[in-house]
Amino acid sequence: MQVSVETTQGLGRRVTITVAADSIEKAVKSELVKAAKNVRIDGFRKGHVPMNIVEQRYGASVRQDVLGDLMQRNFVDAIIKEKINPAGAPNYVPGEYKQGEDFTYSVEFEVYPEVELKDLESIEVEKPVVEVNDADVDTMLETLRKQQATWKETDAAATAEDRATLDFTGSIDGEEFEGGKATDFVLAMGQGRMIPGFEEGVIGHKAGEEFTIDVNFPEDYHAENLKGKSAKFAIVLKKVEVRELPELTEEFIKRFGVADGSLAGLRAEVRKNMERELKGAVRNRVKTQAIDGLVSANNIDVPTALVDGEIDVLRRQAAQRFGGNEKQAAELPRELFEEQAKRRVVVGLLLGEVISQHELKADEDRVKALIEEMASAYEDPQEVIEFYSKNKELMNNMRNVALEEQAVETLLAKAKVTEKPTTFSELMNQTTAA
């Protein structure tokens, strides 16, 4: 077997392999002998068909199978010998085959990039320093009450805390535009769902009033024909409702799993959940900065095959979120996922090199702690822990999470880490925005 390797472009490689004719004929003869044992041809007993007849009848197909097998096996031998690490499936390009002659073919593929980590000391990370205080718990209790609130119709003017039911018709230069009209539209005020100026124009009006408001569509508005345009909305305000918050009664508190129904018990449960969320938010904030710094400091090429694989994964995930199927997933535009897919590949390669260089292995104590932390959010944590322990795939996924955390900690040991005091609400708002 003769082997030559050439670089086509970037990470692209072409391996050209020549297989000696005698190796091919030897393999073909061996396969024909095996086939002859089971061949049934009229006039001959099973296993006693002359080899020349077996070759005449089956030689072409056996030869084709042998060539396919030799191409794969010799390629594997070649990349092992040449110490090449292919990324993605190879493309076999067979040459012309003539019986009794050497056979030459080529294989085209991409390789993994050679990653040399650098400038890890230049990575800068701000670690949020924050605690859950009583005021944070009070705010969360108020949020819980709002989530359980009921609505009561009022004759008073609408405020930023109310809910309004209205009809509206939008127009630009006196002409109605597509998507600018609705009937019995329910608007929860203060959530920023509408374009700037719309809610403000409703506030102060009472049910039964008809009025017009002037607004400007933002320059970055999603509809091209409306970007930056001035518009008028004719509004009929049909109903205004005020939010009625439930009292923190024993019955209300028990809805949240606090058995004794006490306010102290609810506050303790809320604080525990907030601290768990806070721990995760701090961890993710630090991790994101560390990985961003790693990516910025290490510009590497990525194999197209790996990016394509990630795009397929992201397509399927997107389709599943919206109830789509495999066919619909494949039809989603590549451009929607390409940037995210490329970043995932880059991050995977760089963290993989961190793990390899430092010979990291998943810490089983950390794996156990991660499962326990995740399980604590459920009604029966022990049941969740046992479910994970019996599921090999879930355990491997959690080991990967632990290993990634260990890789990030390795980065942080070299990075410039400074502590930044902040508040619970600021951190959680940043997390939501991200």
Curated annotation (Swiss-Prot):
SUPFAM superfamilies: FKBP-like, Triger factor/SurA peptide-binding domain-like, Trigger factor ribosome-binding domain. Pfam families: FKBP_C, Trigger_C, Trigger_N. GO terms for molecular function: peptidyl-prolyl cis-trans isomerase activity; protein folding chaperone; ribosome binding. Its EC number is 5.2.1.8. Signal peptide: none annotated. It catalyses: [protein]-peptidylproline (omega=180) = [protein]-peptidylproline (omega=0). One of its GO terms (cellular component) is cytoplasm. It comes from the Bacteria. Residues 161-246 form the PPIase FKBP-type domain. GO terms for biological process: 'de novo' cotranslational protein folding; cell division; chaperone-mediated protein folding; protein transport; protein unfolding. PROSITE patterns: FKBP_PPIASE. It is found in: Cytoplasm. Consists of 3 domains; the N-terminus binds the ribosome, the middle domain has PPIase activity, while the C-terminus has intrinsic chaperone activity on its own. Belongs to the FKBP-type PPIase family. Tig subfamily. Involved in protein export. Acts as a chaperone by maintaining the newly synthesized protein in an open conformation. Functions as a peptidyl-prolyl cis-trans isomerase. This is Trigger factor. It comes from Yersinia pestis.
